[in-house]
Structure formats: structure tokens, C-alpha cells
UniProtKB/Swiss-Prot annotation:
This is Uncharacterized 43.4 kDa protein. It comes from the Viruses. InterPro entries: PIF2. Pfam families: PIF2.
Amino acid sequence: MYQILIVLFLFALLYIVVWPFYQAFYHINHAQQDYNMTLTDRMDYIEAVMRRRQYVPMEALPVVRFDTNLGTLAGETLRCMSVPLYVSEIDLPMFDCGEVCEDPNAVYFFVGEGDTYVVNGHKLAVGGYCTTNSVPRDCNRETSVVLMSLNQWTCIAEDPRYFAGTGNMTQLAGRQHFDRILPGQSGRNVLFDRLLGREVNVATNTFRRSWDELLEDGSRRFEMRCNARDNNNNLMFVNPRNPLECLPNVCTDVNYVHSTVRPVFESGECDCGDEAVTRVRHVVPGDRTSMCASIVDGFDTNTASHRFRVECVNTHTPIDRFSSDKLLCPSDTFDSNTDAAFAFEVPGSYPLSGNGLDEPTHRVFLDTRSRVQYNDVRGALT
């Protein structure tokens, strides 16, 4: 009797717990279905509501101001901390800021013509300033923006597409694909100043307005010179869609390939050039989107045999292309630094008949083909 009561009690408890969730699900699902079914009919009403809706103007939003006065000095004042104090129009390295700021730890710094110091959203004018906060010393002013925020100075990159890293002196332009550049060659991808006629040196003033500055003819003042070689010893080139990027030759794994072999970005294809000159062609015959290689799949009409490209491992194979599934290259190409692949020929793999059953053996075919006229259904041998 007690067991029956316990079972009934459990069922009642389960009903009490589950039933509200089921009702909520049913109501929400039914309301969503009604909304979806009538959405098209209520488009005019929704547009009218959106037109009548009033938005809060930006000037009506609250302004949050941080109180940077810590009140740690007598008189509840702390000069030169929240905002640097302008003291001179010319550079005075020996200026005593301790007396002006009433703090012996105050330091002097000078903002030059090409420097960018930002305080409370405003750029500091040229001149000398005093501050009680330590100004970043290892911060290249040519490539950086020195930002004052919450009682501290921060050195950030002016344009991280060009220079970033420690002190913002590390060139990133043209070196995005560092893992695809031949070791020791990344420094050859240089940023060139066409106005001054020299490589950009961030240790000196470039007298520029921005890194994207244009010359009078509308061309870019700063351009990439891609003189480095990729990990296949092929010359890198500028990306036509991004003038700040040097690309490796993604259309081939052949070392020292001809310079005319390169991608065609407009069509997404690979241009293998004239085979008589470049010695490479598309890996997949007829497919211009396939890579260019010297060893490709083919068919030998003299022996009625198919040849297949097999990638292998030699002494010049990069570690990122190593695989336990790859074979070692043959002895005649194991120490070669060109194309890490060999051609594997399957003798007699071409069927003469339509069903592949009524076939002579490959040896019989080679011995008798000069005397016997075989019926080639596909006509590839004629």
C-alpha cells in the first residue's frame, strides 16, 4: 500500500514540476509561430513604428570623467600628474620641473614636430612639458603614439601594419608570412621611401604626414620592395590586393622556379608560363587552378601506361612538409633541390577494350604492336 502511495506521490510531484515548463514552451512556441505567419502582413506597421521612434542624441548621454586627483599632497593638489604642464616653446633639457610641479620626482620632456602625444583625446602642441609620471623611454616616437590615460603613459603603435613590437621598431609590413620566408631573408623585404629615395629608417625622421601618404602623381610614397626568397628559394612579390604584403609563390613547390611562374589573383589561377622556358606545367592537366610542377601526371602512348606524380622526401624537404606516409625520393633525386617528387609508371594501365577484360598482356602488346593492329576503343594511342 505504501509503495503505491509513494509512486503516486512521485507522479504528482513530477507533474507539478514539469507542467509549468510545458505550458511555457507551448505558449512561446505558439506565439512565435503566429508572429512568423503574420510578419509579412505587418511590415507597414513595423516601418511606421521605426519612423516614429526617437533616439537619444549623443550630447544627452552622460559624460564619465575620472577623478585623477588622489589628494596625497598638502592642500589636496597634485600638479603635473593628471595633465602635463606646458613650460616652454623650445627644448630645455636642463629645465627643473621639481620646482614647478612641487615634486622632486617630476621630469621634463619635449614634444617635437613629428611626435604624437595624446592627453584626454587632444594632441599636445610642440614644446616642453613637465609631468610627475614616467614618460616611456623605449618608445620610438617616429612610429608610436604616446597616450596619457589614467595617470600613466602608454606607448602604442601608430600603425601596426607597418611597425610594432618592442618600442614599435619591428617592421611588420612585408613580413607577415615569416614562416614562409627563407631563414635569414626576412630583412630583405624592405619598406622603401620613394620621396627620399632610400629605405625607411625609423631611427630618423621621415618627415611624413602618415604612412599612407601619396605622391603628386597619386602613387604611394612608401612601398614594399620584396627582395626576400620564400622557403623554396623563389623570389617573393607584392600582393596586388595589399601593397603592404609580400607573398611567397604559392603556385609551386619547385625550388628556383622561373620568375614568370606566379598566381593570377584576378582569376584565382596559376600561370605556369611557357613550358619550354619554365620547365613546369599544371599538376592536373587542363586545370589552371592546380599548382605548377616539373613532374606531373601523364600518359605514355608508346607503352600504353599512365604516369603518376608521387611526392617524396629528400634532403631539402622542409620539416613542415615531412610526413611518415611519404616515400624517400629515388637516389638520383634524393639530393636534388628542385621538385621533391618522382614519376611512378604503371605498365599497361591503359585498357584497349571498352570493358578492360579483352586485353593482351602488356608484354605481348609491346612485342606485337608493330605487327598487329589493335582495336583501341578510346583512340588515345592513335
